[in-house]
Amino acid sequence: MAKTNKQMIMSICNDINKKEGEGAVYSLGSKHADLKINRWSTGIEDLDAIIGGGMPEGRVIEIFGPEGSGKTTLLYHLASLQSMALDIPIEGTFDADRAKIFGNKPKQLLVYRAKFGEDAMNKTLRFAKAGIPLIGIDSVPSLIPKEDAEKVLKSSDKDSIEEQRIGGTARLLNKYLPMIEEIIEVTGTTLIFTNQVRDKIGAMMFGEKTDTPGGRRLKHSCSIRIQVARRAWIEIPNKNPHNTANSEKVGFIMKCKVVKSKVSNPMGECEIPCFFDRGFVSFDQVKPIRNELMKLRAQKYGKRIPKEDLEDEEESWEEEEDGR
């Protein structure tokens, strides 16, 4: 057994705290060990519940899922809750009208169109130092270093291009995330990445066949990773004479699963209804909103709505065939 010199250990602790500030080294049970995690509500009760009471300040969050699952939609919603937020849509797909639907306002939501991965990361550092409450990067696969982007343009090998993109993104995050984490821990900025699901390169017959771009660094840095999927469409009878579909999709049910959490118990799940014209709502609101939309469509197209449609007790939605 090692010979422990407690007096020397305490002397070292005191010296470190004197040079680096009180609390640089502390023991279990001290006031520094019991610091409360500052959080802000997502405005969605069920989502708050599965992430421990709200989004933590000064942490890295990842929202990932397949295309059309609502990643950007959720990011717009979360940005609208802040006094100021920065959206970095590297994919070039920023939708001002959709951002407004979720409550974002002029001068409250800033948008920076990054050309290359370094642009996005450097602006993230600058705005985080200024203490902006939220930064959203949409999305990880588009975080390509300038040098790698130029190589991709010159390459004709599809597999080589994909490997170049994935490797470049991982290297970029390895370089910048440690600096960003150190800054946001002090300023309280919440950094949210949206990410996609990709087939694993060289995946074996057994085990996970899919993964998310960004490498291990992003996964390690995240305090919360939320997997989202579109479980079902919310529909109403179609009254548009120019549309031959039987029903009109007016929203969807988003399924959220916490696959990693450093600030709460992981693996919690919830489902959230979202309407395209007004954003996220509770399940109690689904039926009244559907009835309202049916009446509006009937007035617009001069169609009568059968009474049984309005009195239907069951919300109408269509399950996704692939279970997403």
Stretches with model-predicted labels:
Residues A33-D34, F116-A120, W233-I236, F280-V281:
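A short acidic, often aromatic-flanked loop/helix-cap motif at beta-alpha or helix-coil junctions
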Residues S27, D87, V111-R113, F193, ...:
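Structural signal for conserved beta-strand scaffold positions within catalytic alpha/beta enzyme cores
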Residues M1-S27, R231-R324:
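C-terminal regions of RecA-like/P-loop NTPase motor modules
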Residues H77-L78, Q82-K175, M179, R297, ...:
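Conserved inter-motif catalytic segment of the P-loop NTP-binding fold
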Residues I166-R278:
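Phosphate-binding/switch region of NTP-binding enzymes
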Residues D15, K19-G23, I50-G54, P66, ...:
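Conserved, well-folded catalytic cores of nucleic-acid-processing
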Residues N5-M8, I12, R39-D46, P56-R59, ...:
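Helical mechanochemical/support elements of P-loop NTPase systems and associated helical scaffolds
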Residues A2-L109, N122-K129, L296:
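The Walker A/P-loop phosphate-binding site
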